[in-house]
Amino acid sequence: MSIFMSRDVKLYVSGISSQVWEIPVLEGYSFSQSTNTAEVTLSEATGATGVSRRGRKMFNNSLAPVEFSFSTYARPFKGTAAYAKAAGDTDNDIHAVEEILWGLLLGADTWTAGDMKRGSSAVSTSDGTDLNIEFAQSNVPTLASGVVLTFVIPNESGSGSMAYEINGAAFNEASIDFDIEGIATINWSGMGTTITEGSAPTTTIDEKITSTSNFIQNRLSTLALTASASESILGSYNLVLTGGNITVSNNLTFLTPEELGVVNKPIGHVTGTRSVSGSLTCYLDDAAAGSADLFEALTLSTGKITNEFDLTVNIGGTTSATPRLRFQCNHSHFQIPQHSFDDVVSVEATFDALPQFIDGTDECSIAYFA
């Protein structure tokens, strides 16, 4: 008899263009599926025989959607012939180990020559300068179908493994944290239709998953914040970050029939309102165009229905030829920063990245550099 060690897990992503990606994950991954039940109870007064029936019965109504979550590091790299990759992909083009996950989150359903696409329209494009990930194809009612996540957990002796397949997987959310003491980490979560036992697939794309030179150091992160020229809050603000978070969410809903007499199973999903939001923390600083000035500007503009800032977060800094990640949000709406009175007073500013027009898809663009 062998036991299984969670630290030996491998994650594979398949179901797109006949490719299989291996994605290294961090401790804390999870996946589960529960049953939705109905309880029928009896509650009556005492009868002539002195009996009061108090029984109950349970019914399985349906299977809830599979819920999964895991974390990866943000790991950009330049392609090389030394690793397995898609046909047509070019050496020295910039990619990311977790690139496929961004594509699936933002509507991609094909992989062609190193780029993620929705049909023939690009979701990600890569060249020798950067990897660009856009939201332009994310206005879709459903995400890619047929996606399978396979978690393979070897046993202690190495003589076998358990493989769990999450079928019909759809990515709901990606949340990137940049605590300055750590490495840039992305937390992924989503849902699927069923969990089944399977087998480990054969990897076709595993570029740079064993590299140790493509991690992003959060301490090097910088922030540029500029008010729109149409705003009464004019100028640029220089905030030195102590931490932060950016979250992209599809607000998915899974659909499950409600027929009686059978255990219903989820049949698929629909997307909800797409949202990009986040928070930025920094020390309270009275330097010119610092956090104190931003707080004052926002409190003095409370009469404005909306505000608009051009927000650029450079996770890992701006130095060329180093691993880094940039979020560009050109129409960000900021809330009044909140103070935290610890030993050193700090402020937290929350924001929502919005499209220029309500039906647009330009609320954010993501770029990797290596």
Predicted segments with their positions:
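Signature of extracytoplasmic/envelope-associated structural regions
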Residues: M1-A370
